[in-house]
Amino acid sequence: MITVDALKSFGANVDEGLGRCMGNEALYLKLVATIPGEKNFGKLSESIQNNDLDGAFEAAHALKGVLGNLSLTNMYDKVADITELLRTRTEIDYSEKVAEIMNARDELAKLCE
């Protein structure tokens, strides 16, 4: 089960995230626990594999918002980086950046078990 201390170790700005949830720790942890199942991770990966930069941008931008709202800073930074590259339709190999994001998602999923 996920804890505030585990999230802090993970790189989340828990105090900021709790502030957005009006100090309701149970609500904050419940919302964070939904992140690994967020469908936009799959959409981002699939869009990149299909070289669909518009679809990848939409997925990354949505993830950026959710991760930012929950102050999952380490994940947010990775997603914000790829979002800006996709916004400008930068033609690069995104596979390493997507892998970093998916690894962070998987690490968070383990914390949520």
Tell me the role of every PLM-derived stretch:
Residues 1-58, 62-113:
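Two-component system phosphorelay core
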